[in-house]
């Protein structure tokens, strides 16, 4: 347990950051699911719109270091491949 005032403050800050980071990662997963569900329904316009918004969110959380940049690139690449396969 934190004993010094600065250790107590750091514990509070870390908990606040942990909750915020978890929320951001969850938002990223939600946007991925929105794209995948739009692809499943076959609605190309909705899938494209969901993809554009998902890419913005994925890039944002990768820039903040919540996910690795390679993981972000992998997600975007796979989603884009599914969109192209749906269009073909």
UniProtKB/Swiss-Prot annotation:
InterPro entries: Ribosomal_bS20 (IPR002583), Ribosomal_bS20_sf (IPR036510)
Composition bias type Basic residues, residue spans: 7-22
Cellular component aspect of the GO annotation: cytosol; small ribosomal subunit
Record flagged with keyword Nucleotidyltransferase: no
Keywords, comma-separated and alphabetical: Ribonucleoprotein, Ribosomal protein, RNA-binding, rRNA-binding
Tree of life domain: Bacteria
Example GO biological process: translation
Region feature Disordered, mapped onto this chain: 1-27
GO molecular function terms listed in the Swiss-Prot or TrEMBL record: small ribosomal subunit rRNA binding; structural constituent of ribosome
Record carries keyword Iron: no
Any one Pfam family match given in the protein's UniProt record, by short name: Ribosomal_S20p
NCBIfam families associated with the record: S20
Function as written in the Swiss-Prot or TrEMBL entry: Binds directly to 16S ribosomal RNA.
UniProt record similarity statement: Belongs to the bacterial ribosomal protein bS20 family.
HAMAP family, per database record: Ribosomal_bS20
Protein name per Swiss-Prot or TrEMBL: Small ribosomal subunit protein bS20
């Amino acid at each position: 347990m934190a004993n010094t005032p600065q250790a107590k403050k750091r514990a509070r800050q870390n908990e606040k950051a942990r909750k915020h980071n978890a929320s951001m990662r969850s938002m990223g997963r939600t946007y991925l699911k929105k794209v995948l569900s739009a692809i499943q329904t076959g609605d190309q316009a909705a899938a494209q719109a969901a993809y554009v918004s998902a890419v913005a969110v994925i890039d944002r959380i990768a820039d903040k270091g919540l996910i690795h940049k390679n993981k972000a690139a992998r997600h975007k690449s796979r989603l884009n491949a599914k969109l192209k396969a749906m269009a073909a």
